[in-house]
């Protein structure tokens, strides 16, 4: 499974590690992904998703149903 948020599709970012002498080497900035069981009110059950912590914060404001509709995800598959 790819290291990608299932709601926001966030993935890792290419960046530079810059030393004191300003030499730059490529590195990857990984997404902070967590497995979470979230109560889905419309389905009356828990849904287990792999989410970024940014998506968890947005989830509290919008709700799981609205975020899934925006992402085009059918929560019955999870």
UniProtKB/Swiss-Prot annotation:
Coiled-coil boundaries: none
GO MF: structural constituent of ribosome
Signal sequence segment: none
Protein name in UniProt: Large ribosomal subunit protein bL28
GO cellular component terms listed in the entry, alphabetical order: ribonucleoprotein complex; ribosome
Swiss-Prot/TrEMBL keywords: Ribonucleoprotein, Ribosomal protein
UniProt similarity note: Belongs to the bacterial ribosomal protein bL28 family.
Protein's GO biological process: translation
SUPFAM superfamilies, sorted: L28p-like (SSF143800)
Source superkingdom: Bacteria
Cystine pairings recorded for this chain: none
Pfam families: Ribosomal_L28
